[in-house]
UniProtKB/Swiss-Prot annotation:
The modification N6-methyllysine is found at K7, K63, K64. Lys-63 was found to be 25% monomethylated and Lys-64 was found to be 36% monomethylated. Can constrain negative DNA supercoils. May be involved in maintaining the integrity of the genome at high temperature. InterPro entries: Chromo-like_dom_sf, DNA-bd_7a-e_arc. GO terms for molecular function: DNA binding; RNA endonuclease activity. It is found in: Cytoplasm. Hyperthermostable. NCBIfam families: Sul7d (NF045555). This is DNA-binding protein 7e. GO terms for cellular component: cytoplasm. Keywords: Cytoplasm, DNA-binding, Methylation.
Length: 65
């Protein structure tokens, strides 16, 4: 699986796409929640910086609506 690199509250983070639970679009950003060792973490990345796997997850989520 691919890793998503993003900044959250000024801190550089990286999360594996297999840990991502929910994905949605906010303007030109892709927001997501992920499993952070039992807690729910949040992150966002621009569409142009998002890996293909994350964009595929977003397309599946939007298709369900």
């Amino acid at each position: 699986m691919a890793k998503v690199r993003f900044k959250y509250k000024g801190e550089e983070k990286e999360v594996d796409t297999s840990k991502i639970k929910k994905v949605w679009r906010v303007g030109k950003m892709v927001s997501f929640t992920y499993d952070d060792n039992g807690k729910t973490g949040r992150g966002a990345v621009s569409e142009k910086d998002a890996p293909k796997e994350l964009m595929d997850m977003l397309a599946r989520a939007e298709k369900k609506k």
